[in-house]
Design a protein with these regions (language model features):
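Pre-NBD coupling/linker segments of ABC/ABC-like ATPases
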Residues: 1-21
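The feature captures the beta-strand-to-loop junction immediately N-terminal to the Walker
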Residues: 39-41
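Conserved ABC nucleotide-binding domain
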Residues: 101, 105, 111-127
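H-loop/switch region of ABC-family ATPase nucleotide-binding domains
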Residues: 184-185
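Conserved catalytic segment of ABC-fold P-loop ATPases
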Residues: 192-199
């Protein structure tokens, strides 16, 4: 393998396929009340590690054990379908987040009200502006009480008015999480929000 300047290590397999070893020798344990910051430059492996924790990527070696429901703010629009209406996407993303039908029903009115989409909630998401889609995804993701919360950088959503109430909702959402893992390149933000820290370089803890 060759060390990659962009992070991780790259090489080729016996079949000639390019492979990237994005993470190596990652070892840590988190318990209730932990707020972990994954700190590192772009390409250091932060987002890849978050995606492993979210279950989106499976590790090729080692063991990952998670007890509790994981809520991800890595991509608040993940699991949404542009051909479906906003209302249908509340149900779809709710299922993607592991919610029951009753839980989805209970959060629907809150999502509609907080997202401020009005009648647009009844039309296909492909007709939305990027800001509207982000507001919907954010409103769905933050409508539940997270047991384990994963965040890729600190989120900023919408125009100035919406951003203010989104910031308040996000702070409340984070405070309810039993465990939080946040990827960031901002040391000061990490110190203000987290109580545990891991620095990554080229996919390894340093």
């Amino acid at each position: 393998f060759l060390q990659a300047a962009s992070g991780g290590r790259i090489g080729s397999s016996n079949t000639g396929i390019i492979e990237v070893e994005a993470l190596k020798k990652i070892d840590f344990t988190l318990t209730e009340g932990n707020r972990l910051a994954l700190i590192g430059h772009n390409g250091s492996g932060k987002t890849t590690l978050l995606r492993v924790l979210a279950g989106a990527y499976k590790p090729t070696s080692g063991k990952y054990e998670c007890i509790g429901r994981v809520t991800s703010l890595i991509d608040p629009m993940m699991g949404m379908d542009g051909e479906l209406t906003g209302l249908e996407n509340i149900k779809l993303r709710g299922l993607f987040l592991g919610l029951s039908k009753n839980e989805i029903k209970n959060i629907t009115e809150d999502v509609i009200e907080f997202s401020e989409l009005g009648d647009f909630i009844k039309v296909p998401v492909r007709t939305y502006s990027s800001g509207m889609v982000l507001r919907l995804g954010f409103s769905i993701s933050t409508a539940i009480n997270p047991e384990i919360l994963l965040m890729d950088e600190w989120m900023s959503v919408g125009d100035s008015d919406f951003k203010r109430k989104a910031e308040m909702r996000l702070n409340s959402f984070i405070s309810k999480a039993g465990i939080m893992v946040m990827a960031t390149h901002d040391d000061e933000l990490a110190k203000s929000v987290c109580n545990k820290f891991i620095r990554l370089e080229h996919g390894e803890i340093v």
